């Protein structure tokens, strides 16, 4: 892992800025070449002194893939050399295959054409394969490929961290062997960085590597200007959508609101918002491409655009529309999410302007994926991109503190020392805390070397300023000029922080406005969907749910399970309950792994946006050790705090007790949350320092006056609140009751009042009757005014199978686990006395 000192330069260095300077200083045996006068060109592969490992870092639109095709044609001319091309996406595989066929190169096929699981034989000697399927290539083929090509290598390596990577160890070992031993390697990407160069230098030797750094980008990028807007303008959205709904059906979808001159919206020229700018261009007859990082906004903005034209195409994961990029010129408006990414490029000069709505959230796409999707449109007639970054999904809690400073301001010496000292310290701490993560993968070669970059990209999504700074650095690396709306003069620290304050306030207001519209973003679910007759649903109910679940409740749950975040929370709470039902799982990793494999793998039914019953695959996390650590700590905390979420709402969590309970296990918990939830938590000692708090407020758009003085106790509450909502969907809220417990005070029994008085240390020896005890309790109200918290749970928790038999009032084992646990050899069960109930076994 390479250490970066400056929080202002970290994002640029992780994406390959100053690459040649680093190579000259640290790897002088590598030859380098700057190309700035035109599209990228490769050295001739036929030249005897050409080095066998070629690394190309160049912006999007610099001609990398064209140069690769020319290089391949040259080296394969009158040759039987074998070629393996490893890609990161199926769409990218298909696009490269089409380009190879158009270039007239014969003998190539894709992994999609294989009828057998294992690809073997001469027909696969020139193969295009997605990295997730690399283990399906026969070892004899892998050991004999002459050329290995990794276009978009950083994205390809990033797939090692994807939930779709089911065979991580095999794939990592195969890719390591290919990079180390195959005769010729070509690696290309717009964000190749020093980590990759350093790894390949160790594997192949500096004397065998040549690096090309392209500094040219096609005019479609180099002339492009990007403006980051500070307001979404939902007042215009609501105005148009409300009128649109009231129109007769025969007049839809074309609409002109006649509140202004010439039947157009009355928008002030000074009203520069996302929707005002979009409205002007739609009314002006311009063609628009629009990227959205969320599905819901893509549907909302599609309905907005339909008010002006019926020529609208929407591409997201909930629609079955095939991605035919050649048809885009038939539409005035094309709206897409990250389903359109590397490997797909629209080259026609059809669209005038690009708009982008980006919402950084812990479960959303990282900024590199956003950047890749923005680059799919190669030419814009007006060379303008307007971006709105929704800050409402980023964390404002003290456990999430921004780590990065904007590099443009830093280059001008504009960041005060009080900011840079704090963020540099946080970057150092983050690097330190990444080192012990993913211990289960330490034996691998590639995965551990890039875990820091992966965790950095995921964890920074909790902070809007970090996300903005990363995107800013990526866009500038592609020679795109970036400006901030309202900051027309030189961007400085004060203007940047003011921008964040306005952006966060606008985002919160905008989210309230869009809540009413989001319900209609997708097709409504038919009530008559018959899920009860499905065998798959019946098996699902038997495995996870109470047998008395009602059809309407089941339908609602299956609809929610179509969302990845709900599926993750569903498995987490199921595992928490299973571990508490089987205490041996808390002491034996083998027992835990068997239970986890049972609940976190296989197919489960879902109801998609179309309202039809479907299935999705659950994939176990390879990092079972990290999961084991996390669930053990959560089980311990739940036991000590009296949290039983499947048994009903839980009340009266005392923050003092919470702090005491969390103290001993904080380090293990923080590391586990970083590994499993990709969520980096700032410890209390760091978070409570005055400079850190000031930096947090300034770079998060939070005004100091609105927040009380924090403490270790409030930090513990914040940490628990944030992480348990992410992991389990449980919400921690301030209790509004006077006394602990959910029973109304007038309904308290004598024993319950005695317990309350004893818990508060109140002497009740003189009180014998219920009336006397009640009077004493009411006189002692002031002693119960300490802050307490309730835990609110999702409605679907009522459907899950629990250890508690409510009718009998007893706890019991989950019966369906008996056959699963019977497969575990007795030697793997814990030997600690008291850990196993031998009667149950």
UniProtKB/Swiss-Prot annotation:
GO cellular component: a single term: host cell nucleus
Annotated GO biological process: DNA replication
Pfam families in the record: Herpes_ori_bp
Cellular localization per UniProt: Host nucleus
Alphabetic keyword roster: ATP-binding, DNA replication, DNA-binding, Host nucleus, Nucleotide-binding
Chain residues that bind ATP: 58-65
Keyword presence, ATP-binding: yes
Record bears the keyword Nucleotide-binding: yes
GO function term, MF aspect, one: ATP hydrolysis activity
Domain Helicase ATP-binding: start-end pairs: 45-210
Recorded family membership: Belongs to the herpesviridae OriBP family.
Biological role: Functions as a docking protein to recruit essential components of the viral replication machinery to viral DNA origins. In the presence of the major DNA-binding protein, opens dsDNA leading to a conformational change in the origin that facilitates DNA unwinding and subsequent replication.
Subunit structure: Homodimer. Interacts with the major DNA-binding protein. Interacts with the DNA helicase/primase complex-associated protein and the polymerase accessory protein.
Stated name of the protein: Replication origin-binding protein
Source organism (scientific name): Gallid herpesvirus 2 (strain Chicken/Md5/ATCC VR-987)
Origin organism lineage: Viruses, Duplodnaviria, Heunggongvirae, Peploviricota, Herviviricetes
Gene behind this protein: MDV021
């Amino acid at each position: 892992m390479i250490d970066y000192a400056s929080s202002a330069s970290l994002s640029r260095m992780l994406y390959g800025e100053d690459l040649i300077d680093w190579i000259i200083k640290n790897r002088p045996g590598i030859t380098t070449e700057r190309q700035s006068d035109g599209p990228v060109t490769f050295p001739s592969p036929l030249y005897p002194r050409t080095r066998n490992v070629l690394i190309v870092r160049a912006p999007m639109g610099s001609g990398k893939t064209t140069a690769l095709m020319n290089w391949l044609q040259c080296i394969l001319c009158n040759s039987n050399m074998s070629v393996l091309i490893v890609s990161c996406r199926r769409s990218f595989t298909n696009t490269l295959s089409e380009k190879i066929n158009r270039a007239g190169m014969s003998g190539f096929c894709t992994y999609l054409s294989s009828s057998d699981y294992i690809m073997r034989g001469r027909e696969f000697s020139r193969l295009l394969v997605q990295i997730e399927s690399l283990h399906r290539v026969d070892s004899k083929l892998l050991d004999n490929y002459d050329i290995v090509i990794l276009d978009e290598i950083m994205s390809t390596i990033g797939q090692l961290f994807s939930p779709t990577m089911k065979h991580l160890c095999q794939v990592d070992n195969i890719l390591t062997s290919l990079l180390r031993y195959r005769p010729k390697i070509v690696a290309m990407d717009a964000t190749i960085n020093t980590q990759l160069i350093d790894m390949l230098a160790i594997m192949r030797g500096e004397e065998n590597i040549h690096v090309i750094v392209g500094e040219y980008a096609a005019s479609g990028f180099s002339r492009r200007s990007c403006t980051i807007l500070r307001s979404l303008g939902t007042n215009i959205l609501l105005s148009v959508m409300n009128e649109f709904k009231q129109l007769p059906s025969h007049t839809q979808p074309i609409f002109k609101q006649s509140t202004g001159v010439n039947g157009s919206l009355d928008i002030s020229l000074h009203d520069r918002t996302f929707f005002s700018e979009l409205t002007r261009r739609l009314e002006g007859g311009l063609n628009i491409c629009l990227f959205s990082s969320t599905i819901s906004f893509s549907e909302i903005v599609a309905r907005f655009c339909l008010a002006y034209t019926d020529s609208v195409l929407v591409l997201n994961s909930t629609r079955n529309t095939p991605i035919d990029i050649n048809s885009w010129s038939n539409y005035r408006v094309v709206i897409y999410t990250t389903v359109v990414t590397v490997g797909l490029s629209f080259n026609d000069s059809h669209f005038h302007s690009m708009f982008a709505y980006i919402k950084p959230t812990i479960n959303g796409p990282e900024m590199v994926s956003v950047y890749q999707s923005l680059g799919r449109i190669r030419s814009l007639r007006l060379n303008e991109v307007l971006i709105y970054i929704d800050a409402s999904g980023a964390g404002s809690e003290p456990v999430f503190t921004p780590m990065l400073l904007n590099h443009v301001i830093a280059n001008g010496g504009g960041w005060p020392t009080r900011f840079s000292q704090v963020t540099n310290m946080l970057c150092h701490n983050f690097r330190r805390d990444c080192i012990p993560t993913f211990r289960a993968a330490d034996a691998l070669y590639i995965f551990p070397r890039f875990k820091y970059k992966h965790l950095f990209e995921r964890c920074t999504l909790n902070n809007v300023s970090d996300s903005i700074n990363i995107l800013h650095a990526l866009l500038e690396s592609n020679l795109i000029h970036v400006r901030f709306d309202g900051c027309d003069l030189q961007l400085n620290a004060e203007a940047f922080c003011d921008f964040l304050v306005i952006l966060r306030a606008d985002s919160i207001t905008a989210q309230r406005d869009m809540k009413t519209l989001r319900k209609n973003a997708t097709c409504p679910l038919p009530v008559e969907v018959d899920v009860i007759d499905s065998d798959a649903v019946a098996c699902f109910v038997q495995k996870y749910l109470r047998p008395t679940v009602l059809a309407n409740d089941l339908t609602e749950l299956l609809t929610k399970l179509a969302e990845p975040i709900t599926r993750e929370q569903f498995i987490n709470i199921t595992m928490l309950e299973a571990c508490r039902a089987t205490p041996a799982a808390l002491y034996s990793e083998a027992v835990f792994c068997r239970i986890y494999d049972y609940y976190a793998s296989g197919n489960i039914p879902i109801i998609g946006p179309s309202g039809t019953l479907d299935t999705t695959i659950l994939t176990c996390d390879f990092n079972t050790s990290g999961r084991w650590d996390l669930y053990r700590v959560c089980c311990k905390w739940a036991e000590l705090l009296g949290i039983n979420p499947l048994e009903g709402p839980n009340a009266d969590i005392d923050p003092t007790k919470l702090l005491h309970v969390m103290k001993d296990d904080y380090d293990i918990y923080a590391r586990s949350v970083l590994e499993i939830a990709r969520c980096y938590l700032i410890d209390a000692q760091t978070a409570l320092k005055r400079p850190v708090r000031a930096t947090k407020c300034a770079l998060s758009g939070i005004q100091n006056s609105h927040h009380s003085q924090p403490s270790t106790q409030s930090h513990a509450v914040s940490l628990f609140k944030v992480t348990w909502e992410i992991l389990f969907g449980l919400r921690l809220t301030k209790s509004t009751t006077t006394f602990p417990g959910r029973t109304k005070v007038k309904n308290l029994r004598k024993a319950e009042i005695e317990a309350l008085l004893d818990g508060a240390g109140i002497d009740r020896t003189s009180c014998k009757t219920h009336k006397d005890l009640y009077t004493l309790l009411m006189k002692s109200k002031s002693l119960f005014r300490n802050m307490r918290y309730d835990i609110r749970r999702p409605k679907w928790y009522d459907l899950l199978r629990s250890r508690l038999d409510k009718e009998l009032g007893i706890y019991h084992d989950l019966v369906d686990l008996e056959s699963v646990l019977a497969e575990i050899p007795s030697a793997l069960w814990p030997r600690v006395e008291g850990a196993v109930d031998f009667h149950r076994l």
